[in-house]
Amino acid sequence: MTHLKLGTGVCAITMLLLGVACGDDEESRPPGTITQTGSGGTSTGGGTSTGTTPTGTAGGGVGGGASGGIAQNYPGDVGIENDPDVIFADDFESYGQASDLWDRWDNTFQQNQTRIARETENVYAGDQAVEFNLPAQNQELSNAVVKVLTVEQDSMYLRWYSKFDTLNDIVGSSHNGGGMSAHYDSGPGVPADGTNHFLVLFEHWRGEATMAAPGEMNVYVYHPEQRDVWGDHFFPSGKVLPNTSLPFDFGPDFQPGTDVIPELGRWYCYELMVRANTPQQRDGRITLWLDGSLLADFGNLRFRDVDTLKINQFELSFHAHNVPVETKKYYDAVVAAKSYIGPMVPP
């Protein structure tokens, strides 16, 4: 596991819309080659075996990305919303208060725990970002913003900047990142069957207090081959929760990488690509980038058995079952697009 120090720079109604599981789930640099090194591989007994760290450019064909990305043409992300491949972009600069998020997002939750942040240290770019707060309590709570797509997509890229505050000490179920889903109307605890829904969230998992907060980066996935009624967690090393002793076949081109824990209090650039498979083929894919470097590339995936099941929304969230100390998470500079976006280029 690597403690990465890069860059500077969901429950009831929310469960229904975001598809986060609320049960006992085991739960900026320019583009370039990945810099982490270490062990990786498919877990065969609760740990990770040795293996090769993934390499490759941030775009360069991985996950269908184009080298460099959309953002390189829009320094400071200025005008990026006008790019023909961009579906949505929000720098959070237009909001006077949290209730104004309804102007551009289709759903927001826990507005009494949501704030437009203006402190310099809590904004990645410009003058504002969005802040989600989780108060100290032993009851489940989810903050989120959700965008419903006008045109559903077979594949999509989602990039955002985010940081945890330094007080985060959450252990166990917590959905704390961004992601996308296809018609997750039935809510969590209903397995994907190839026709009803799928969901992918790029987040962090901390199963034990002995692990550093906020836990290891992973994708939380509802797919037809999931191992429980709750979603699976795919880690860059190839480890899959639950049942880590059971390998998962990510295809012959999968290169096990390093399971990464980000540093609290630092901004990171996260990017997620989801490509739904062709029905009756295993060509679905999930690709993750961190600060423009490839973090994980999961292939050989099956999300659907019918081509009418497409991505119809994306979200940013901060959810937990049990919060020992009040903690906050910040988001800024979110872009959804049809091709690789990449980190923001300085203006």
Predicted regions and their residues:
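Trp-centered recognition loops
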Residues: Q153-S155, Y161, Q255-M273, D283
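Secretory/extracellular carbohydrate-interaction modules
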Residues: F109, V123-S245, V335-M344
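Ser/Thr-rich, Pro/Gly/Ala-heavy low-complexity intrinsically disordered linkers and tails
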Residues: L18-G69
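Carbohydrate-binding surfaces in secreted/extracellular proteins
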Residues: F92, G265-L301
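Extracellular glycan-recognition surfaces and repeat-rich motifs
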Residues: A98-A129
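Extracellular carbohydrate-recognition regions
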Residues: G63-N107, V200, P347
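Extracellular carbohydrate recognition
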Residues: R282-T287, N322-A333, P346
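Flexible glycan-contacting loops in extracellular carbohydrate-active proteins
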Residues: F298-D332
